[in-house]
Amino acid sequence: MKILGIGNAIVDVICKVKEQFISQNNLSKGNMKLIFNENEFQKLLANLKIEKTVSGGSVANSIVGLSQLKNEVGFIGKISDDDLGNKYEEGLRKENVDFFYTKKKENIPTGTCLILVTPDSERTMCTYLGIAGKISENDV
């Protein structure tokens, strides 16, 4: 392996929404909101229809791009032993990324970014770091 990235392992959850959803939830269209409260995040998610999930996070996205350019790459991140964590791991493996991770059965879910796409294709993001935000030197 020639290139290794360390970052937040975040599953991008893509959902189509109407403009009304953005305003009703006090979101700022086209921006990203960091959500610290899991209940607030789950409340948003409960009202959405998931179109697609993708392994994401800025470092992982860069590593995937480098893999697609035929580089030998790896990524270090932290996921939970849950459905989204499994999807995250599978997504990176499909992109030929060696994934070095700490996978824990904890009450903290895998990090997730809701990507809310309005009819004009504008993206508004709501990110809950979950366990990704708990990565430490012990995980590396």
Segments and roles (model prediction):
Residues 1-76:
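Glycine-rich phosphate/adenosyl-contacting loop at the front of the ribokinase-like
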Residues 14-18, 88, 128:
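Short acidic, glycine/serine/threonine-rich loops at helix termini
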Residues 54-61, 84, 106-109, 132-139:
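Short secondary-structure boundary/capping elements
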Residues 91-108:
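A glycine-rich helix N-cap at a beta->alpha junction
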Residues 100-105, 115-140:
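Conserved phosphate-binding/catalytic loop of the ribokinase/pfkB sugar-kinase fold
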